[in-house]
Regions:
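Carbohydrate-binding surfaces of carbohydrate-active enzymes
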Residues: 53-57
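Long, charge-rich, low-complexity intrinsically disordered regions
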Residues: 1-36, 42, 52, 65-70, ...
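Cytochrome P450 catalytic domain signature, combining two hallmark sequence patches
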Residues: 45-48
Length: 243
């Protein structure tokens, strides 16, 4: 469940606020992955020397000491990164795609834009070509790879954008419970905590109430919301725990 914002940390309104563990829970990934992608990391190269891998982008929120905290747009960009990785797209291709998309879209976080939804295929395929090993175009393996990855891109974009709301060219909301309208993550509301969309109650509070009361009906009466809303909140919170 989302943690309380540090008392001394002033978060600009409308951006959203997530600690690394909170974001990892919503994205169903390990916290270390988010830290590596947004903080960078080091690894030992083939020659035995340490190599520094830079962050994929800079987080929306300023650092408070050593703590990495991210905004809503960061969360959605990370969701795309994960979607590509889960389709076996290498991280170096994703990094190149981000760089190329930034230059074309003009946004630091280009995946969470309408422009990437419409023009991203060509950006992705060009990034893939640039990342292909030398000589693969001559032996024909590039053709197979590009055809396969056209389908990969289509699947990632269709699945990832289907539960996102876009306004003025940018992703502004995420409906994280299978796209159902009852639950929303909106950076303009409660710092981006998952909420019952029409009532504003945090899903975590609804789920806790249902557990404490031993009944979704009693929790619904307590919060003055329909039982179906509590059921969805409980289902959503349980899905995060099971991930």
């Amino acid at each position: 469940m989302l943690e309380t914002i540090h008392e001394t940390h002033v978060v600009p309104l409308g951006i959203g606020y997530y600690t690394v563990p909170e974001a990892a829970r919503l994205l169903r990934t390990a916290p270390r992955n988010i830290s590596r992608w947004l903080d960078g990391y080091s690894y030992r190269g083939a020659d035995g020397n340490m190599v520094k891998s830079s962050p994929l982008w800079r987080a929306q929120l300023p650092r408070l000491g050593d703590a990495l905290e991210i905004g809503f747009r960061d969360l959605i960009e990370l969701r795309f990164v994960l979607a590509f990785l889960r389709q076996n797209v290498p991280l170096n291709v994703i990094r190149r795609c981000l760089e190329n998309a930034r230059a074309i879209v003009g946004e630091e976080r280009p995946f969470s834009t309408h422009r990437f939804r419409t023009d991203g295929r060509s950006i992705f395929l060009e990034s893939l070509r640039e990342a292909l090993p030398a000589g693969s175009a001559e032996d024909g393996s590039a053709v197979i790879d590009l055809k396969t990855n056209q389908l990969v891109f289509k699947q990632v974009v269709e699945r990832t954008f289907k539960d996102l709301d876009i306004e003025e060219g940018l992703v502004v909301r995420w409906r994280p419970y299978g796209g159902k309208p009852s639950i929303v993550i909106d950076p303009a509301r409660s710092f981006g905590k998952p909420l019952a969309a029409d009532f504003g109650a945090p899903t975590s509070a609804l789920a806790r109430a249902a557990e404490a009361e031993g009944s979704t009906k009693r929790a619904a009466r307590l919060f003055e919301v329909p039982v179906s809303v509590v059921n969805d909140a409980v289902g959503f919170e349980q899905s995060l725990m099971a991930a």
